[in-house]
Amino acid sequence: MKKTLMAVGLAAVISIPFAANAADYVIDTKGAHASINFKVNHLGYSYIKGRFNKFDGEFSYDPANIAASSVVVNVDTRSLDSNHAERDKHIRSADFIDASKYSTATFKSTEVVDKGNGQLEVKGDLTLHGQTKPIVINAEFIGAGQDPWGGQRAGFAGTTRLELKDFGIQVMGASSYVDMELHVEGVQK
């Protein structure tokens, strides 16, 4: 009788699908599967686009409990690249982001809100130009699964608008803000 109860109990436990747990990921910058891009208005006539070439970070994601998710990203502001060396030098200067003095920008999430259908609201603190301010990133879960090398990956995209004055950065020409576009693919630890 004991053996029968144990067998039934074991069978019941094995047949229950395991709930997804939070998984920790490293942002895949080595494989160039992530990017931090920006767009700023140029003189009211067009947009300048660029990116930050050096950054790192990690995130925790639990599809069964989105609120338990978190993200931390560190950006080397000296790696700003708008595909124009003289302009990059000027943007990195004390006139704007002062990358020699403030070489790292950091984002740390404080809350992740599930908006439904893969849409997320990632709230957190951004430290840029020596100022820490709360921001919201509107994000989208792209997908997750096994990669061809036997690892697990998860990917997200997001956007946010940063008001330059909030971070003590002077207005760049016609634009008082910069739009950020983020693409993140993580490799599970």
Swiss-Prot record:
The keyword DNA-binding does not apply. The keyword Iron-sulfur does not apply. It is found in: Periplasm. Its main location: periplasm. Residues 1-22 form the signal peptide. GO terms for cellular component: periplasmic space. Gene3D superfamilies: Lipid/polyisoprenoid-binding, YceI-like. SMART domains: YceI. InterPro entries: Lipid/polyisoprenoid-bd_YceI, TTHA0802/YceI-like_sf, UPF0312/YceI. Keywords: Periplasm, Signal. Belongs to the UPF0312 family. Type 1 subfamily. NCBIfam families: PRK03757.1. This is UPF0312 protein VC0395_0473/VC395_A0785. The lineage of its organism: Bacteria, Pseudomonadati, Pseudomonadota, Gammaproteobacteria, Vibrionales.
